[in-house]
């Protein structure tokens, strides 16, 4: 797959932000913005490796109209083939915009 740095997430289903094999390089940070007018949302940001989940953040509330920047620069997230996927899960179908800052 091809790496995509920007995502609009609107579902409670776990979504891949970066899939294993995307070769996204070093992921320095993940910017999460709750763009809903009135509702808060809880967010999980997950590294998945070979079916095992490792939480970067779990059940963190992002109030409506605010953002959270997660620094991942010190984490060894390897998105080459058969390695790590970066995933997101929302507590409700509240729209969250995601921007991934990476360096190849």
Spell out what each predicted region is.
Residues 51-84:
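Intrinsically disordered, low-complexity Pro/Gly/Ser/Thr-rich segments with frequent PxxP/GP/PP motifs
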Residues 37-58:
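Short, surface-exposed beta-strand/strand-loop-strand elements in extracellular ectodomains
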Residues 43-48, 70, 78, 102-104:
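Generic preference for flexible, low-structure residues
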Residues 1-25, 29, 35, 81-83, ...:
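C-terminal interaction-tip segments
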Residues 38, 76, 94:
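Glycine-rich nucleotide phosphate-binding loop and flanking beta-alpha elements
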Residues 14, 42-44, 59-61, 69, ...:
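Ser/Thr- (and often Asn-) enriched beta-sheet segments in non-cytosolic proteins
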């Amino acid at each position: 797959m091809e790496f995509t740095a920007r995502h609009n997430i609107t579902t409670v289903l776990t979504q891949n932000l970066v899939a294993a094999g995307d070769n996204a390089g070093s992921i320095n940070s993940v910017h999460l913005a709750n763009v809903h007018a009135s509702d808060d949302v809880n967010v999980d940001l997950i590294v998945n490796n070979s079916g095992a989940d490792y939480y970067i953040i779990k059940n963190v509330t992002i109030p409506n109209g605010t953002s959270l920047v997660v620094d991942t620069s010190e984490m060894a997230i390897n998105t080459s083939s058969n390695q790590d996927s970066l995933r997101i899960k929302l507590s409700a179908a509240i729209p969250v915009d995601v921007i991934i800052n990476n360096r190849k």
